[in-house]
């Protein structure tokens, strides 16, 4: 046939049987990739430390999606929340992966069957004897089935009526677990961070889809609309399908990057805005202030800060710190977190508490500046020693740790103080193992960053595809160079003067 690579899909034009076949094969490839990727991730995943080495630090991509839908146990005897289990059941991580691979194999066989047996009676228009598809009817069927699945997910799976529920956590990602969710029918259901909105919106959208599907099955489109939107052309279906997909891709890119109830930080890592706004730092200080108000010592209150909360307050977990071509997991960058060293409190020789200015997201290097409670600069690590006025040596800065592994330890020698001041720029200080994975010390992004980048990129690409195929189907006659009135113009007797549409003969 000699088709160029960008026109190979014309082989399934006007061939409904093989059009169905290639779509089934595509489903086989997608399901096969998902199952295989899940098995690969399970082979390399280390579940031993869900606090300091969670799935998102290890670069897991499909495990978080399984987990948010209610899968938490493995046939390997471990649970995602830590600890061991004896009876994981069939719907474990491996069970879901296996189901996808089996489904992929069945789709593969079905695709081959439909490719061989393409000329089925069901695809034949009995009036013309030619292959054709009733596209508005197919649209109604698909809309009805999609609505049914959407309603079922919201009403049964999410609510726990028949299913496990979904992953739900607190605002600081500390107490997450799989649980059933009640639908939120009030205005709070529109809050993207309220899990109840997931149930209610799926129920509402599913109901709408079912009703719309029944409408399109029972009502035929008006002839003018049918012709105007080219409803008989399969490329119209392609164009509108691409529109639905790119719109969905833009939406999920947004919910992933900015955060929502559907993208919990325990599964995908924190967002960059939580670092920018000092979200976890504020919560830590709130807890410390509450403890001090109850006459607890600094050592006591900082020792009660959960290691998980402190770990979120570290710039290495910011998904925007990864570079565009830095492949690999976060653990391959700054290393595997081993333990929290504690919170460093810096003081000058006059006893003032000093705070290290934190590094903004888009800086690779940043000056070490220590300010007091009023924001006045009191100490720094100068670029030129000859010009310095506020150097650690001159100001006499000391550091003492509270909580963590160095609880109660203090340092006064300038070299050590400057070392911890530099590290305090990056948030809470952790001991990181860079030897095990030969980590290079350069920050990586989390799956949150990869997902956003991938879906935003493909959304832009698919937007172009929608415009392209929409234009092709709407202006097919123009692109083909065929004027719809051409036959009328050359027909003998249609016009009093040949080719002049203003002299059209009137029918008597």
Curated annotation (Swiss-Prot):
UniProt protein name: Photosystem II CP47 reaction center protein
Annotated HAMAP family: PSII_PsbB_CP47 (MF_01495)
Molecular-function annotations in GO: chlorophyll binding; electron transporter, transferring electrons within the cyclic electron transport pathway of photosynthesis activity
Stretches that traverse the bilayer: 21-36, 101-115, 140-156, 203-218, 237-252, 457-472
Membrane topology listed for this record: Multi-pass membrane protein
Main location: plastid
Name of the encoding gene: psbB
Top-level taxon in the UniProt lineage: Eukaryota
Keywords: Chlorophyll, Chloroplast, Chromophore, Membrane, Photosynthesis, Photosystem II, Plastid, Thylakoid, Transmembrane, Transmembrane helix
Entry keyword Nucleotide-binding: no
Cofactor note: Binds multiple chlorophylls. PSII binds additional chlorophylls, carotenoids and specific lipids.
Organism field: Helianthus annuus (Common sunflower)
Function: One of the components of the core complex of photosystem II (PSII). It binds chlorophyll and helps catalyze the primary light-induced photochemical processes of PSII. PSII is a light-driven water:plastoquinone oxidoreductase, using light energy to abstract electrons from H(2)O, generating O(2) and a proton gradient subsequently used for ATP formation.
Protein family per UniProt: Belongs to the PsbB/PsbC family. PsbB subfamily.
Subunit structure: PSII is composed of 1 copy each of membrane proteins PsbA, PsbB, PsbC, PsbD, PsbE, PsbF, PsbH, PsbI, PsbJ, PsbK, PsbL, PsbM, PsbT, PsbX, PsbY, PsbZ, Psb30/Ycf12, at least 3 peripheral proteins of the oxygen-evolving complex and a large number of cofactors. It forms dimeric complexes.
SUPFAM superfamilies (UniProt xref): Photosystem II antenna protein-like
GO BP, sorted A to Z: photosynthetic electron transport in photosystem II
UniProt cross-references to NCBIfam families, sorted A to Z: PS_II_CP47 (TIGR03039)
GO cellular component: chloroplast thylakoid membrane; photosystem II
Location within or outside the cell: Plastid, Chloroplast thylakoid membrane
